[in-house]
Amino acid sequence: MTNPPNGCPGKVLIVGGGIAGLALAGALHRQGVACQLVERAEAWAPVGAGIILGVNAMAALRNLGLAEALESGAQPLEKMTIKDADNRRLARTNLADLQPRFGVSLALHRSDLHDVLLQSARHVPMHMGTTVTSIEDRGDSVAVTFSDGDKGLFDLVIGADGLHSQVRELAFGHRPLRYSGYTCWRMVVGGGLGGGGSGG
């Protein structure tokens, strides 16, 4: 890839406007890196359910200057309990005891996190209803063809387009998904059911 003197890619394409794509777009813009984003959806809409931001995620978001915006509308977690299918407790963590050293963990709706990230990347050019149909690595650049027929040359192409990534398939060929053995159920419940901010 061809890089400018400061070592940062000169022109970056981010494919996918989810959590990772928007976080990266905002971060690159703040560093003065020219980037643009394409998103398959025709328009932004609330997607997903509840999400937990652990202390590691909050540390990363704090480095991006976004922690305060998230904390104002989220539920701090005081404890977390893990149980098996028979309701037997496997583990319990008192998160409140860890906050002085590691910071807070938050529970919030995924769309609330997405909105904060979208606001942080508001100055990045975004092309909605657009996908990538071909990628060609030319050594010193990457040639990209888009679903609307447009073409572009980029120093770096980043696939942040999710589980069924078109970028991954174009770059590495089709690889079937492999079940990890884990299943996660997510839901949204009324705030009064959380036991005063508890996670268990």
Locations of regions flagged by a protein language model:
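Conserved hydrophobic helix-helix packing surfaces used for dimerization/oligomerization
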Residues: 12-14, 35
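Glycine-rich FAD pyrophosphate-binding loop
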Residues: 29-49
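Glycine-rich NAD(P) Rossmann-fold beta1-alpha1 loop
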Residues: 18
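N-terminal Rossmann-fold NAD(P) dinucleotide-binding loop
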Residues: 21-22
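Conserved N-terminal helical subregion
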Residues: 2-12, 29, 54-190
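Active-site substrate-recognition segment that forms the wall
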Residues: 199-200
